[in-house]
């Protein structure tokens, strides 16, 4: 299976929402004290606005048929000049997901490599990622 990484488009909304829902349900199962099962992280309109915003690039991994099998939600952040730090940009990975049926096929690695190259191409100092545990 050949995988293509590209910016998310309107045609990717449904599958991205489905993957977001799967991630939310996993989080709700593990941390019901924080996450609410059966809800959504974004509405369709909110997700479209995120797709359209250059400060919040979303990249998708698509298979040969164009089906989205993973995503990386990113946020461009700028550290303004201060008395102790220079001005610089960073690309923050807010969310990364690979479809359960495609795990172990290096889709996540392809997404991460693409994000790193995008950060370099856009003058970012680094790429950051937070994890919960």
Residue locations for each model-derived region?
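Hydrophobic adenine-recognition pocket in adenosine-nucleotide-binding enzymes
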Residues: 8, 96-98, 131
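Conserved GNAT-fold acetyl-CoA-binding loop/helix
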Residues: 25-46
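Conserved acetyl-CoA binding element of GNAT-fold acetyltransferases
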Residues: 84-100
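Conserved acetyl-CoA-binding loop-helix of GNAT-fold acetyltransferases
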Residues: 98, 104-117
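Conserved GNAT acetyl-CoA-binding A-motif
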Residues: 119-131
């Amino acid at each position: 299976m050949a995988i293509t990484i590209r910016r998310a488009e309107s045609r990717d909304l449904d599958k991205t929402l489905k993957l977001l829902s799967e991630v939310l349900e996993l989080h709700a199962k593990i941390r019901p004290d924080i996450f609410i099962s059966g809800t959504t992280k974004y509405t369709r309109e909110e997700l479209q606005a995120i797709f359209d915003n250059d400060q919040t690039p979303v990249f998708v991994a698509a298979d040969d048929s164009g089906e989205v099998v993973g995503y990386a939600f990113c946020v461009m952040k700028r550290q303004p000049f201060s008395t102790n730090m220079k001005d610089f940009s960073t690309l923050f990975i807010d969310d990364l997901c690979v479809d359960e049926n495609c795990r172990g096929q290096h889709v996540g690695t392809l997404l991460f490599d693409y994000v790193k190259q995008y950060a370099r191409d856009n003058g970012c100092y680094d790429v950051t990622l937070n994890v919960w545990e």
